Amino acid sequence: MTKRKQPNSQMCFICGMQNPLGLKLFFYEQDDESVTATFAAPAEYQGYPGVLHGGIACALLDETIGRAALRAGREQWMMTAKLELRYLKVVPTGVTLTIVGRVEKSSRRGMTGRGEIRLPDGTLAVEASGLYVALPPGQRDSMQALLPMWQVVPD
């Protein structure tokens, strides 16, 4: 069962509602501590004909794992330090994919998380693990002014 819709930003490539080139995904916090999103990639995001570009899959997982930190109660800005992916199946365009992110371990300085992209039949197509670190205090303080650009946007 879905618990809560997370906020979207204005210009983020993945969730920015005002980004004309963005994917405009919505993220939802689940009862099992995960964050999920769905996405059907149009042909413009293909690498090979009919196949989602691997860089788009990477961006989807990066964002979803990072958002799992918000689900876990981390109220600070974080950035990706390391992200590893395993591409297990061809990911087609034009079908609804499910993207899931979870926190594995959290500390004062950062967190590790895992993510996956599943095909419509539930088959695991891509899996990822990532290390995310807290922004240094000076950078974090300057980012606080950008919080008004994040809001919960209706579906």
Walk through the language-model features, giving the residues of each:
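Hydrophobic beta-strand-centered segment that forms part of the acyl-chain substrate-binding groove
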Residues: T64-T98
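A conserved, well-ordered hydrophobic junction motif at loop->secondary-structure transitions
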Residues: T36, A41-L60
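A structural signal for short, well-ordered beta-strand segments
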Residues: A37, L83-Y87, G101, G115, ...
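Non-catalytic linker/capping segments at the edges of enzyme domains
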Residues: M1-E44, P148-D155
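Hydrophobic core residues within well-ordered beta-strands of beta-rich domains
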Residues: E33, M79-A81, L97, M111, ...
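HotDog/MaoC-like acyl-thioester-processing domains
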Residues: M1-R4, P92-T93, E104-D155
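Short solvent-exposed loop/turn micro-motifs enriched in small/polar/acidic residues
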Residues: N19-L21, T96, R108-G110
